[in-house]
């Protein structure tokens, strides 16, 4: 599998969060205050394809967006395929 195809088939939660934050027009400073996390740590979150569930829960509440559902939908689409 080439890198581009693999990239498209993998869930990257950090990119999803960054995208939703931008869509809502909110700053990383705002989010860091809401979730009690430094901006530097949030930038690291954006670069990672994984996240701790407790932090994801806080981000979901702050942005009023269900990222857990994104994960669930990804699972449903890929549960029978090799990831």
Regions flagged by a language model, labelled:
Residues 48-61:
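Short, basic-rich loop-to-helix N-cap that marks the start of a DNA-contacting helix
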Residues 1-27:
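A short, Lys/Arg-rich alpha-helix, primarily the initiator
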Residues 31-32:
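Short alpha-helical "recognition helix" segments of helix-turn-helix
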Residues 64-83:
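Short C-terminal boundary/hinge segments that cap the last helix of small helical domains
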